[in-house]
Amino acid sequence: MIEHPGFVLWFTGLSGAGKTTIAVALENQLRARGIRIERLDGDTVRQSLTKDLGFSKEDRDKNIERVTFVAKLLSRNNVAVLSSFISPYAATRDHVRGETTNFIEVFVDAPLETCIERDVKGMYKKAIAGEIPNFTGISDPYEAPANPDIHVKTHEQTLEESVQTIIRRSSHGWNRTNTFPLKSRPNPPHRHKSKSSRAGEPFISPVFVLSIIA
């Protein structure tokens, strides 16, 4: 396994925008090259860690709060974390940024109409009919990132193009003497170290981790 600083790629967007699809593709590329990585997904988490929560704003915030705790533990122990969650509220996403190591916000963008067309489970149809309350994009708001670190448009880009955009933009956003994205809002400085936490181990910049698969 390659030793590297932990980081969190946080995929946010409407249901059906392509968050999980992109995260899985990126995970496969990273894992095949020996990167220590874990993927956290909204559907999976709600079947286990947060199965007691609903979809009110309070419960949504609690959902992300628990996920943030897991991502925080993983990233500070040099694990790359791919997190795919609608996470509709800007303030909540900003909180995640402040709590985790080397946070990169990825806005997976697609028009609502496109997401509805992709909805094979018919969730949007049920939400429009009023059968599902608090459904993001229909009866509950989605606060799109005003200045995401990375912005992919899945209605215009192929899956491979989206993945390569993330790799390229992430690599451009890091340098070899810093451990957080240069173009994003920095995490609290005391949470990060510019060298490996283990004495004697070489420091490998996140730009290297992502650039080796470009």
UniProtKB/Swiss-Prot annotation:
Disulfide bonds: none annotated. It comes from the Bacteria. Its EC number is 2.7.1.25. ATP binds at G13, L14, S15, G16, A17, G18, K19, T20. This is Probable adenylyl-sulfate kinase. It is an enzyme of class 2 (transferase). Residues 174-199 are annotated as: Disordered. It comes from Pseudomonas aeruginosa. Catalyzes the synthesis of activated sulfate. Keywords: ATP-binding, Kinase, Nucleotide-binding, Phosphoprotein, Transferase. GO terms for molecular function: adenylylsulfate kinase activity; ATP binding; sulfate adenylyltransferase (ATP) activity.
